[in-house]
Amino acid sequence: RLSESVVTRTKIAKGQAMSRGVMKIKENNLDMLIDFGVPAAHKITFGDWSNPEYDIFGDIMKAVKMLKDEGKIPSRMLTSDTQIQRMRKNKGIQSAIYGNINAGRLVTMNELRSIIMEEFGLQIATCDERYAYIKADGSRVNGRYFDEDKVTFYTADVSGRAGTGLWGPTPEEAEY
C-alpha cells in the first residue's frame, strides 16, 4: 500500500507540473508549493472551448507561435478527453476539415489528430487518469492527475517523454 501511495504521489506531481507549472503538497503535515519556473507569459488563459463557435485554432496558433518565437518547437499537446471532445465539436475545426458542406458533423479522432499535426506539427496526448484519496474528514474523493480544462504544449523526446524522473536515496539516506 505504501509503495502504491508513493507512485500515485509521483503521478500527481507530474500531472500538476504539466497542467499548472507548480506542484502543491498539502499532506503529511506539509503545506508547500513548488514552482517549476514556467514563465507567466506561457500560462495563457484561453477562451471558452466549450462554445462550438469559439476559435480554438486561434488559441493553439497563439501558443505555438509564442513558443516558436522563443526558439522552442513544441511537438506534443497534452490535454483531457473533455477538451478533445470540445475540439471535435468545434465549428471552426469542422469547417477546416469538411468545409461548409458538412457543418456540424462530428470530427473523428483520426481527423483531429491529422489536422493538428498538419497545421501545428503537434501530436495529441490525453491524460484522464484519476486517483482516490481520503480527506482529513475521512471522506473518500477522487482527483485527476491532469487538470480537466487545461492544455499543455511541450517538446517531447522520441518516446513522448518530457524530462526524466529520478529515483534514489535522499542525501540523508545515503549517510547510512
Name each model-derived stretch.
Residues 1, 13-15, 88, 157:
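Functionally constrained cores in energy, signaling, and assembly domains
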Residues 1-8:
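Long, hydrophobic/aromatic-enriched structural stretches that serve as scaffold segments
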Residues 12-28:
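Short, glycine/acidic-rich hinge or "gate" loops at secondary-structure transitions
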Residues 31-111:
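Extended, solvent-exposed, turn-rich assembly/linker loops in the middle of proteins
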Residues 94, 99-176:
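Sequence/fold signature of self-assembling virion shell proteins
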Residues 8-15, 72-73:
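Intrinsically disordered or highly flexible coil/loop and linker segments, enriched in small
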